[in-house]
Amino acid sequence: MPTVLYAEDDRDCRELFAFTLRLHEYNVYEAINGAQAVQIVRDEPVDLVILDVRMPMMTGYDAARMIAGEAPHIPIMFLSAKGLQREVQTAFGCGPTVVDYLVKPVSPDQLVGRVDQVLQVSRTAGLEAVRQESLAREENVYVQR
């Protein structure tokens, strides 16, 4: 069973998505801030990290930089209400293991579908393939606006 770490300071959002991931047979660790997320990655086997951007103690950006440096094999996704192009660029600039950026609102089924896809592609084609697909999708979104 794949293991996902979901770091989100909003309790309702965190519990909803963690519950949904568990229903789809994922093991889920929950963190309420970036510092806790980094510590979980250090202590536990994790297949994917999902980070909110704005969290207390340590932002998702800072956590992503640390995780990418310490665990370069773990893909990182952002799930945030912040959807400006500069925020997406900042997220992808946190390291080569940042493979996706989803803008809330996202339905639980959309999140699970993207988690499934990221894990499948990263296992078969590697993190860079997932990252390039996500970057192309983001670029297309901003071109259409």
Question: Could you tell me what each predicted segment is?
Answer:
Residues 55:
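Receiver (REC) domain active-site loop signature in two-component systems and cognate sites
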Residues 105-115, 119, 127:
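C-terminal output helix
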Residues 30-48:
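Acidic, metal-coordinating helix/loop segments flanking the phosphotransfer/catalytic sites
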Residues 11-29, 96:
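Two-component/phosphorelay signaling modules centered on CheY-like receiver
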Residues 121-145:
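CheY-like receiver
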